[in-house]
């Protein structure tokens, strides 16, 4: 029992041992596993610890770096603040400097503008001084030119032709080159004397020369008719010592009182106050065409025939006879053909126009007053009208009166035009010569410009413009009324007939006479002559 018990005990012990052994082994294994786990965990913990330590070190390093960066950032912030403050101060300083610069620039601009204005004022004053000097010099030369013209005539009377010629040319030269009027009477007359610019002839019977007509295609030839029934062909011929006018009497009949003459198709038509109309050739052969009763005064070329104008009627002439007549509604004072229209002026101041078919239409008068002389220039399309008080009016193609040309002191009775030169005759025993290119129009425009303008505005000349001298016409006074004026075929000379029976051929071109005179000059004025006649205010110059 005891053995059994011992056995049992041993068994139990063995079992217990086995059980404890097994349990211990299990626990050991578990412990070992735990230990392994713990070792692994320890290793991991060590690693973690090391990593943590490293991370902590890194963190400390990063913290140190962060602290350093923060410190630097703070330093940068402080520096930035300082820089911002400095920049603000510099900006303020720059703004103040800019304001000062702007202020200085404004001052400089004002000073520059003031300097420019002062310069402009100086330039204006200089220009004004120059202009004043130019005006003074111009006026001085114009005045001197007039004095030289008078001196020229005096020297010619004193039989000093060379000096007289030089003074006449100098007079024209100073006027021509200083916008003066080279048609100043004394200058023009001194040129005429120097160039034999006027020729004279006395009608054979001494009748009043009522009309003149140039001979087409013949220089220096015209036909003159008088109230004594004379019809003479006048010709300029060269002679010893110059030129003279010779005459060929084509007709003389004291019963005729010729009032007009016209040359057409190589025939001469001479119109008597009470008729007839005499038709002549250049040999003196003639036929007489009887006219209806009237006081006849003008011949007007119309188509292939003529219009014979009486004071109260019009008659048409063609193919050697009168083909028709018409009574007028009033008394004619003047008549002229203008671009296919016949202009009729009446003694009551009325005006009418007649077309090619003979229809007469009353129109508004072109101007106030009674028109007593009319001439139409086809080249310029200028209608020239002279009136009872002696005034002459140029009218352009638009029926606009361009200017008032105060001329004769009595009735203007005849007008002609050669290029820009207008010549008028009147009952004041004077013939006037105007150069329209020299005429100072109120509008400020030239004659050529005025001709093309339907309307004009008054224009004020610029301050820098030396004024053109007002044109005063050349006046030639005769011993009788200047009844007839007619341009010569040369386009420069004009025939003038007077009530005393004289006929003159006058060169109406100052420039042409000046050129002739220049060509004949033999020398220049000496220094002493220059000082004597011209003076010291105008520098010496030569003309030869």
What are these regions (language model features)?
Residues 223-227, 269-272, 307-309, 343-346, ...:
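Conserved beta-strand element within WD40/beta-propeller blades
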Residues 219-220, 265-266, 303-305, 339-341, ...:
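Short coil/turn segments that connect the beta-strands within blades of beta-propeller domains
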Residues 198-203, 242-252, 285-291, 321-327, ...:
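A short beta-strand motif characteristic of beta-propeller blades
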Residues 232-237, 280, 317, 354, ...:
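WD40-repeat beta-propellers
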């Amino acid at each position: 029992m005891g053995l059994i018990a011992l056995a049992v005990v041993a068994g139990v012990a063995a079992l217990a041992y086995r059980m404890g052994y097994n349990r211990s082994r299990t626990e050991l294994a578990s412990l070992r596993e735990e230990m392994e786990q713990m070792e692994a965990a320890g290793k991991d913990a060590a690693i973690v610890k090391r990593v943590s330590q490293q991370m902590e070190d890194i963190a400390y390093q990063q913290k140190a770096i962060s602290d350093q960066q923060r410190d630097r950032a703070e330093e940068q912030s402080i520096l930035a603040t300082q820089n911002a403050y400095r920049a603000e101060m510099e900006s303020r300083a720059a703004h103040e400097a800019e304001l000062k610069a702007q202020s200085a620039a404004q001052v400089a601009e004002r000073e520059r503008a003031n300097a420019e204005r002062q310069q402009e004022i100086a330039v204006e004053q200089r220009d004004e001084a120059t202009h004043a000097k130019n005006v003074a010099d111009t006026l001085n030369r114009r005045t001197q030119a007039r004095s030289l013209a008078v001196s020229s005539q005096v020297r010619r009377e004193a039989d000093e032709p060379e000096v007289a010629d030089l003074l006449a040319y100098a007079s024209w030269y100073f006027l021509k080159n200083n916008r003066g009027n080279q048609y100043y009477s004394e200058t023009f007359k001194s040129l005429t004397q120097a160039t034999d610019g006027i020729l004279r002839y006395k009608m054979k019977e001494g009748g009043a020369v009522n009309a003149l007509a140039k001979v087409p295609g013949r220089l220096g030839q015209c036909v003159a008719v008088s109230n004594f029934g004379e019809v003479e062909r006048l010709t300029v011929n060269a002679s010893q010592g110059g030129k003279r006018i010779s005459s060929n009497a084509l007709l003389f009949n004291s019963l005729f009182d010729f009032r007009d003459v016209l040359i057409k198709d190589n025939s001469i038509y001479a119109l008597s106050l009470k008729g007839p109309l005499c038709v002549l050739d250049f040999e003196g052969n003639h036929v007489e065409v009887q006219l209806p009763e009237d006081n006849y005064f003008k011949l007007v070329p119309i188509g292939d025939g003529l219009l014979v104008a009486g004071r109260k009627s019009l008659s048409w002439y063609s193919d050697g006879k009168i083909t028709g007549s018409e009574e007028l509604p009033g008394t004619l004072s003047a008549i002229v053909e203008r671009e296919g229209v016949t202009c009729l002026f009446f003694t009551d101041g009325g005006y009418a126009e007649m077309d090619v078919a003979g229809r007469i239409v009353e129109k508004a008068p072109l101007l106030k007053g009674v028109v007593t002389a009319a001439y139409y220039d086809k080249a310029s399309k200028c209608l020239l009208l002279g009136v009872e008080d002696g005034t002459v009016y140029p009218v352009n193609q638009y029926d606009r009166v361009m200017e008032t040309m105060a001329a004769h002191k009595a009735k203007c009775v005849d007008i002609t035009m050669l290029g820009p030169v207008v010549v008028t005759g009147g009952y004041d025993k004077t013939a006037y010569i105007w150069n329209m290119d020299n005429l100072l129009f109120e509008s400020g425009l030239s004659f050529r410009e005025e001709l093309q303008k339907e309307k004009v505005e008054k224009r004020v000349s610029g301050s820098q413009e030396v004024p053109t001298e007002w044109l005063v016409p050349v006046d030639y006074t005769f011993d009788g009324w200047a009844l007839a004026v007619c341009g010569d075929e040369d386009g420069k000379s004009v025939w003038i007939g007077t009530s005393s029976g004289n006929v003159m051929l006058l060169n109406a071109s100052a420039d042409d006479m000046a050129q002739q005179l220049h060509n004949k000059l033999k020398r220049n004025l000496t220094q002493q002559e220059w000082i004597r006649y011209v003076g010291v205010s105008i520098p010496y110059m030569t003309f030869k």
